[in-house]
Amino acid sequence: MARQKQFKRKKNAINGWLVLDKPYGLTSNEALGKIKRIFSPQKVGHAGTLDPRASGLLPVAFGEATKTVPFVMDGRKVYRFEVTWGAETNTDDTEGEVIATSDVRPTADTISPVLSEFVGTIMQVPPKFSAVKVAGERAYDLARDGEEVVLEARPIDVHRLDLVDCPDDNRAVFEAECGKGTYVRALARDLGRRLGTCGHVTELRRLLVGPFGEEDLIELDEILETAEELEEGEGVDALVEEFVLPVREAMDELVEVPVSEDDAAKIRKGMAVLLRGRDAPLNTEVAFASHASVPVAIGSIEKGRFQPSRVFHL
């Protein structure tokens, strides 16, 4: 196996987003570790953990893009997942022990009519094996220690839940568009119960997070292969040009206010500026100022004045 090429001579000042297609079997932090070793960035993080048994979209933020992580994490997510009927597990996926079984196998005709009950703002009890905190401790830590975990139902937003396919009598494939805090494993569990059977997730893939979708996905192997093919002296800049999206991609849904070069300089010093122009917004809770299409700062607008809260160094 070829040794993985790395650029370790110095920490690289990289700013932007890499939309990684996380492979099945890796934790999100393991995938992030591989990206760190390839790019050697000064600062890096990810926006939204994926379970090891899930694959798909893992947004990776470099440098100044880490300041925009909350806008990505608060955005909508789309998941495609397979539910296997007839067994419920204590983890609500294939990793756990079977705790209930059923001979009932729902069909497309019985599944479709109940899906609307799971759309909108609904109450959901998270899986016992989840990162939800109970008295300051993670639920999965308590569950692994054999302690009885009782989690309260909490509101979640499901914008769309579609039946995609029924490959055979034992399985059904769904696609869900949902908000922050939704557990797809719990959705599968509750679907099974509502249909008079048991169910657990056997495949899970994330297709969208906030502004990033399938068209943005980059496979880890593609990055590794490109790194190996670089000519001597090309370094990490060639990888950044090939795979890293601009910081502003994460702020597509925010109000953008273009400012002059002089005002941009003031904003970078933390000063508020009066916005000019007939179309300038008067009041906005969250917006970002830009100059020459480059983000300057995130902030708020009150009575026509932009007040920065987080300044970009781009």
Predicted regions and their residues:
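Accessory RNA 3′-end/elbow-binding domains used by RNA modification enzymes
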Residues: M1-P23, N29-H46, L50, A54, ...
